[in-house]
């Protein structure tokens, strides 16, 4: 997948946008917020809307020609036409974790090109941890960006780890575990299982802290695109049923089931999910 000349500028812009939006989210997290319900009964807070406004503004400044598919915009019925290239934005992934005052929620921003993520940033403001990946250059990094500081933290390269001989570490959803996930993991040589919210599951695999993340439950494209990009840039893969790559720009933006992994080639999923 070839890199475009403007990708470096866009990459740095989405890193900055994620940090700025994360500061907004964190300020609201430490203060107070209202919780409402969307048409699909999922929760939404002041932080979702405020962070999305920041991200939309920044992306339109750096790349006004690229459409943006953002979770709260879609919920409000504002869905632009897309072509080969568009942004996917989840301003607050892990809203349930946010509401319950657990720290594993993230800001997710990704650039999709030809149905695959090419740039992605996942920022966890409560943990001061940022993960970013450029798939075209196969480079991914982690930095500990403090939302209370204007200083930029050092960037440390991240890579998936080799398959361990003593068993896999699997990561799964804190809020959305399913019997199907349990059955799938029973096929694998899993020695430990970690539960965490949001796109941090992708990031644990990308940093070599875990080996496998099966998601046998519903997700939307904005939930996964940024973490997907980080993982692939770090040397991992994300498989849809049949062992094919998970693709984007689907008509409803709803994902199939998928398996994210490091160097492991996992057992294939059957069916569409």
Where are these regions (language model features)?
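Oxyanion/phosphate-interacting regions
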Residues: 1-16, 22, 183-187, 202-273
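N-terminal subdomain of lithium-sensitive/metallo-dependent phosphomonoesterases centered on the IMPase/IPPase/PAP
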Residues: 1-92, 113, 179, 183-186, ...
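Residue-level signal for inorganic ion chemistry
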Residues: 25, 48, 59, 95, ...
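Short, hydrophobic alpha-helical packing/hinge segments within bilobed ligand-binding/sensory domains
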Residues: 51, 107, 201-202, 227
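Glycine-rich active-site/cofactor-binding loop and its immediate structural neighborhood
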Residues: 83-125
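Acidic beta-strand-loop-alpha-helix segment within the catalytic core
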Residues: 109-203, 246, 252-273
């Amino acid at each position: 997948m070839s890199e475009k000349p403007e990708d470096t500028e866009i990459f740095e812009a989405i890193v900055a946008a994620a940090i700025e939006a994360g500061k907004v989210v964190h300020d609201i997290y430490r203060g107070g917020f209202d919780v409402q319900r969307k048409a699909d009964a999922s929760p939404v807070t002041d932080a979702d809307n405020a962070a999305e406004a920041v991200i939309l503004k920044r992306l339109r400044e750096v790349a006004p020609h690229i459409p943006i598919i953002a979770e709260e915009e879609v919920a409000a019925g504002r869905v632009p036409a897309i072509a080969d290239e568009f942004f996917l934005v989840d301003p607050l992934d892990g809203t349930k974790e946010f509401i319950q005052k657990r720290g594993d929620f993230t800001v997710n921003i990704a650039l999709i090109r030809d149905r695959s993520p090419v740039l992605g940033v996942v920022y966890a403001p409560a943990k001061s941890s940022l993960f970013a990946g450029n798939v075209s250059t196969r480079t991914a990094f982690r930095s500990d960006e403090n939302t209370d500081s204007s200083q930029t933290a050092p960037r440390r390269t991240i890579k998936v780890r080799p398959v361990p001989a003593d068993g896999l570490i699997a990561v799964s959803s804190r809020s959305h575990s399913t019997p199907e996930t349990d059955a799938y993991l029973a096929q694998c040589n899993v020695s430990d299982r970690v539960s965490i919210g949001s796109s941090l599951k992708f990031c644990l695999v990308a940093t070599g802290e875990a080996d496998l993340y099966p998601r046998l439950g519903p997700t939307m494209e904005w939930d996964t695109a940024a973490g997907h990009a980080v993982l692939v840039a770090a040397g991992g893969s994300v498989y849809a049923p049949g062992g094919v790559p998970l693709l984007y720009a689907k008509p409803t933006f709803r994902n199939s089931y998928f398996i994210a992994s490091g160097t492991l080639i996992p057992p294939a999923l059957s069916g569409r999910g």
